[in-house]
Design a protein with these regions (language model features):
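Metal-dependent phosphoester-hydrolase catalytic domains
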Residues: 3-123
Length: 123
């Protein structure tokens, strides 16, 4: 949980990169970079299409704001094995939407949704 992300990070103003980009790796050597496909999608998006892992109610506007704040970053050797990343978002994951009790529990538990990486098939 970075509580920041691409475009909303104070470090971006100071260092020219968001905290997420810094942790993913900014060195020229890709072997030293971590991987998170959701972060990559957000960093490459030019129109604001990005996965989200958190949902906050903005009372004055009477609406919800969503952001990508939670990440699981893995090394290049694990990423090369194509593990299955998942954001347990009750509105954006049809497998969760199909189970109303699970969707309700995720909404009640936190303003952040779990992020998992299934490595069972790759290790």
């Amino acid at each position: 949980d970075f509580n920041d992300g691409p475009g909303i990070d104070e470090f971006e103003k100071l260092f020219g990169h968001s905290g997420v980009e810094i942790v993913l790796g900014t060195t020229p050597d890709p072997a030293l970079h971590l991987t998170d496909p959701h972060a990559t999608m957000a960093l490459q998006s030019k129109v604001g299409l990005t996965p989200t892992t958190a949902r906050f109610y903005i009372a004055p506007q009477k609406r919800f704001f969503e952001a990508l704040l939670d990440f699981i970053m893995v090394s290049p050797d694990l990423a090369a094995k194509a593990p299955d990343w998942r954001i347990w978002h009750p509105f954006n994951d049809p497998r969760i939407t199909a189970i109303p009790d699970l969707a309700d529990a995720l909404l009640a538990a936190s303003d952040h949704f779990p992020v998992t990486v299934d490595l069972s098939e790759v290790i």
